[in-house]
């Protein structure tokens, strides 16, 4: 029930943000180490200080999500050891420290358990298993202690846990929140952080270097704050549910993002909504989803393909890009690339959009500019140019089903 309430809150927020575009349609596990350390504790009530947030984002983030410190007065203190897993089976706050090899922090608690892990200068290096593995809980908080630096590394190929493909340094089957006042460094031969439900980030400094998706979730990714640096061969933020294309949303209300990605900087299946934050994205495609809404933020995109791309990936949303505010600077590479590419509608009601490239905009449906400033190759234009007339970008690539590509026009007229 708690997870359903959280999902409803996110859906309500996204529905409000997407008003300009109407919808198109209304375990068992194996412990890999030779020995195990088990920690149990009765639930302790954390002191919570409410953070300033907008009325909309408050429906997504709870007070505890946004609180960057934990009440450790009744916390269980644990020290890591080589070759030993630390298994948490009950709700509560756990302060973990130490350096270890081939050791995992495992959460396997009751369905209603809320577990808070406080990392205090932790260093874990594993060859084939997650450093933090959430098997079962209601929600898990991973909090970096103030002034701490924590490093989690997986150096080899991940080994499955039974039927579960554990392919990330932090791997969670349930809801997970990352926050705190310290630093978290993640290095992975696959994904960085993977959540099979919802992932929330509300604070801390997070550095991810990986070969696959840096942060991926089945249902949603929500970010309120934090300093996030990503270097990946695939996507920076990726939300997709292989079994349900009505899931896979991304909501960002703040934070600083420096993303270098081989594929997409930010990719959602259903929606991407940006209400704030500072973004520097260098990637093939900058921001991609079925339905994209930008209300505020400072966004700089350098893309070898499209800067912002809306293409049909979900039956739950209409294909649309809406820009209501913010400062956007988009630079594209040479070739069949577009600054803003919508396989549906495009609306600009506010903000400043500065596009440098061969084609500024490409849209298949309706385009309306009722406000804001649009600059194309140094010249301000009151109309939205269109370089349609050909193949259109899809999720993860360009061109139609026959491989035909669009023409190369699209300067303001």
Predicted regions and their residues:
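A composition-driven surface/loop motif
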Residues: 2-413
